[in-house]
A protein has these predicted regions:
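Glycine-rich, small/hydroxylated-residue low-complexity segments
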Residues: 1-269
Length: 269
């Protein structure tokens, strides 16, 4: 149970003085652990900002070394009220959020595994009028090790059963994105460089307190580290990206074969 102190007081305020979450853990003789995490209902209001959360129940399992981890659980609902940069009141709500996933730590220091996230409904409203309604959203991701555990093949599946914008039914969509032949060591180097650069940005108040400048610098950090990912000549495949509505259905299939600039002998175009 979380202790109420100066650091955690804002969380207790949101939970009306109650502990915002409780964790009950069990550790076996092998050192493996299982934890039941109970997130308590939250209600927070300050001026034009409001946050309401139904609470949720999650279970976290880990082996003794923390190399194998799984997390599953669900939250019934949540709502956020805020004011955007145009001084408009914006409200976001969600219903029935569920997650289920597991991962293991690979030899090169990055995690691989499976993750699934689903959301029954999400609404976005501006000035009391519904702008968008998304129903039946599901994201599934997986990554597998090949070539003696040195290479990653990954896949992301996204589906949306219904999208309505200003009460107009725009249809449903699906996306399957595959990225193969990712060099594990290169991915680790990319991750370390990118994370180090973004953490350095947060230590600079003139950047961290300017959202537009911060996003610009984060993008620069991403693209400066991106060439590291080209080791192994990864392949990106989109098959399909499809959208279906009352007018019909359209689909796109695309494959990109990337080359490591350090190994290519062709002159840049």
């Amino acid at each position: 149970t979380l202790v109420n102190n100066e650091v955690s007081k804002p969380l207790f305020d949101m939970a009306k003085g109650e502990t915002p979450f409780e964790i009950n853990s069990r550790i076996g003789y092998s050192g493996d652990s299982s934890s039941d995490i109970s997130l308590k209902p939250l209600n927070y209001e300050q001026k034009d900002e409001k946050v309401a959360f139904s609470g949720g129940e999650f279970q976290l399992n880990a082996d003794r070394d923390g190399k194998a981890i799984s997390l599953s659980g669900e939250a019934q609902s949540g709502r956020i009220d805020a004011v955007n940069e145009y001084n408009q009141k914006v409200q976001l709500t969600f219903n029935n959020l569920k997650t289920d996933g597991s991962s293991t730590l690979a030899s090169f220091g990055e995690r691989v595994g499976n993750q699934k996230l689903s959301l029954e409904k999400m609404t976005i409203s501006v000035e009391g009028k519904e702008l968008a309604l998304l129903e039946g959203m599901e994201i599934s991701g997986k990554s597998d090790l090949v070539n003696d555990g040195k290479t990653i093949n990954s896949q992301l599946d996204y589906s949306l059963n219904s999208l309505k914008v200003q009460n107009q039914d725009l249809g449903s969509g699906k996306l399957t994105l595959k990225v193969g032949q990712i060099d594990g060591e290169a991915w680790h180097q990319f991750s370390q460089q990118y994370n180090a650069q973004t953490q350095a940005l947060l230590a600079q108040p003139e950047i961290a307190n300017n959202p537009e400048l911060y996003q610009e610098k984060v993008t620069e950090a991403f693209f400066s580290a991106l060439p590291l990912m080209l080791k192994g000549d990864p392949v990106i495949t989109i098959a399909p990206l499809s959208w279906k509505n009352s007018q019909g259905e359209s689909a796109l299939n695309l494959s990109l074969f990337l080359k490591d600039p350090a190994t290519t002998k062709e002159a840049p175009q």
